[in-house]
């Protein structure tokens, strides 16, 4: 959109791994993100972005990125079916065994 105007463009970087930014345009594009140093040497991010789809639907994604990887969340993302009961039971057994100190290397 050539006529889109920047409504918000705020950035803060403390130089120690902590930062924040926010950006928004008049055509509905928005993003924000904060970052902090992680406990295992990684950077931890938390943020979101949104924009309007061609049909007028607002697409919004929130996310966390840390030592566990990128973890997006959105109503637009597909969700797999739940694990069947026998798989859930196996996961419970594995958790019990880990709690008892049992490992399988």
UniProtKB/Swiss-Prot annotation:
Report if keyword GTP-binding is assigned: no
**Tissue/organ expression:** Arthrodial membrane.
The record ties this protein, via InterPro entries, to:
CHIT_BIND_RR_consensus, Cuticle_Struct_Prot, Insect_cuticle
Keywords carried by this UniProt record:
Cuticle
Which segments constitute the Chitin-binding type R&R domain? 16-81
Transport listed as a keyword: no
Gene Ontology MF: a single term: structural constituent of chitin-based larval cuticle
The record's GO CC annotations read: chitin-based extracellular matrix
* Residue segments, region Disordered: 1-21
Q: What is this protein called?
A: Cuticle protein AMP1A
Lineage of producing organism? Eukaryota, Metazoa, Ecdysozoa, Arthropoda, Crustacea
């Amino acid at each position: 959109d050539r006529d889109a105007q920047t409504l918000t463009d705020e950035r803060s970087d403390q130089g120690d791994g902590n930062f924040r930014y926010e950006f928004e345009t008049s055509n509905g594009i928005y993003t924000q993100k904060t970052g902090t140093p992680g406990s295992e040497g990684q950077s931890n991010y938390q943020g979101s972005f949104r924009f309007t789809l061609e049909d007028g639907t607002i697409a919004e994604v929130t996310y966390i990125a840390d030592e566990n990887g990128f973890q997006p969340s959105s109503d637009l993302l597909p969700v797999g079916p739940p694990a069947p009961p026998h798989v859930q039971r196996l996961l419970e057994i594995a958790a019990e065994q880990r709690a008892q100190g049992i490992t399988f290397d």
